[in-house]
């Protein structure tokens, strides 16, 4: 899959993001996927053991890549959260930074590479490697679980910063297998929620389903230099985050899928790339599972760092 590095001020642009792997992924996978998909689906779907309990679902507001290096309230909460969660057999990550068009991909690598999909940051950030193994067998389980659309296995991606910058704090030993699922950016919000519903079956196989994005994300409207804090610097950001929190409290999934109707949505979700991972997590959570707030607050004034656990 062809990749390009992006400056963080551009990494929420759909035009830029969809070029990440579009040529290689769509030409070699989506356009010629039939034979590949049939071959993959014919493989054994053996999982890596049966867990003693159903795994939770989590959503993480990942914010800036610099959080990988930071020691702040957000990263300290991630570190503590990793110790509270039951140990998974594997992690399936749906990151805002792997977008595709017309197809959904899943990483099949034995050893997924660490992707530094950003620019303009200190060398120390580019030096980070998160050497978690992949899990092709459970990736094949994901192919079989998703009924909404064909899912194509691919070797052409890895772990982008939406995944590894948070896992570095959650699971610093990088000893839990990780694989990613792409977001088909041509599809509406209801589609992403429905795919999340399909992915719920993996929870019973020991998989921790993780969405990584931000429920409020508009890089052109951030207030850089604003200290991290509990409240947003702009009313539209606070209003939308509060609306999401209220809908979660009542598990009003319908309102969260129809997010455009929530207060401040036009600015808070100027592009939906960072909101869609939240819908995968919401869908993978049972409708009766309470949403537990793990962390809430804002970085750069308007980036919601809200983190949620279901189950």
Model segments located where?
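N-terminal secretory signal peptides and thylakoid transit peptides that target proteins
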Residues: 9-37
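Long, well-ordered alpha-helical scaffolding segments within enzyme catalytic domains
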Residues: 74-84, 190-205
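Surface-exposed, charge/polar-rich loops and edge strands
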Residues: 177, 185-187, 198-208, 215-311
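Flexible, glycine/proline-enriched loop segments at strand-loop-helix junctions
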Residues: 64-66, 125-133, 154, 182-189, ...
